[in-house]
Amino acid sequence: MPKQVIIPPGTTTPIAPFVPGTLADGVVYVSGTLPFDKQNNVVHIGDPKAQTRHVLETIKSVIETAGGSMADVTFNSIFITDWTNYAAINEVYAEFFPGDKPARFCIQCGLVKPDALVEIASVAHIGAPT
């Protein structure tokens, strides 16, 4: 089955050669998502909760555009710049995954823009198209 490019309406033009998501064989692959506005500027500078919420809302829009929901997420890759933000990021993360949690990992690293505190990439299994 060929892949389908997923670009939600009003999505920011990426700053590198990639798309927000792809769908193949009922699996949505969401690119690493940063807390960017439509001009690729970091939003909510210094606020890990607001940045995490922005990132997860963006991921949600990609998955919903593909026909799924956040309940379909099976794996997240989380990148944070400072472990002191870990609890705040997890607090917001739990709001988006209230039931069965997806598998994930979380590492501390530098991100592409210094004011970004969190980046998340996701995988969601939405099943065969109807």
Swiss-Prot record:
<dbReference type="GO" id="GO:0019740">
    <property type="term" value="P:nitrogen utilization"/>
</dbReference>
<comment type="function">
    <text>Involved in pyrimidine catabolism. Catalyzes the deamination of 3-aminoacrylate to malonic semialdehyde, a reaction that can also occur spontaneously. RutC may facilitate the reaction and modulate the metabolic fitness, rather than catalyzing essential functions.</text>
</comment>
<dbReference type="InterPro" id="IPR019897">
    <property type="entry name" value="RidA_CS"/>
</dbReference>
<dbReference type="GO" id="GO:0005829">
    <property type="term" value="C:cytosol"/>
</dbReference>
<dbReference type="GO" id="GO:0019239">
    <property type="term" value="F:deaminase activity"/>
</dbReference>
<dbReference type="GO" id="GO:0006212">
    <property type="term" value="P:uracil catabolic process"/>
</dbReference>
<dbReference type="Pfam" id="PF01042">
    <property type="entry name" value="Ribonuc_L-PSP"/>
</dbReference>
<dbReference type="InterPro" id="IPR019898">
    <property type="entry name" value="RutC"/>
</dbReference>
<protein>
    <recommendedName>
        <fullName>3-aminoacrylate deaminase RutC</fullName>
        <ecNumber>3.5.-.-</ecNumber>
    </recommendedName>
</protein>
<dbReference type="InterPro" id="IPR006175">
    <property type="entry name" value="YjgF/YER057c/UK114"/>
</dbReference>
<keyword id="KW-0378">Hydrolase</keyword>
<comment type="similarity">
    <text>Belongs to the RutC family.</text>
</comment>
<dbReference type="InterPro" id="IPR035959">
    <property type="entry name" value="RutC-like_sf"/>
</dbReference>
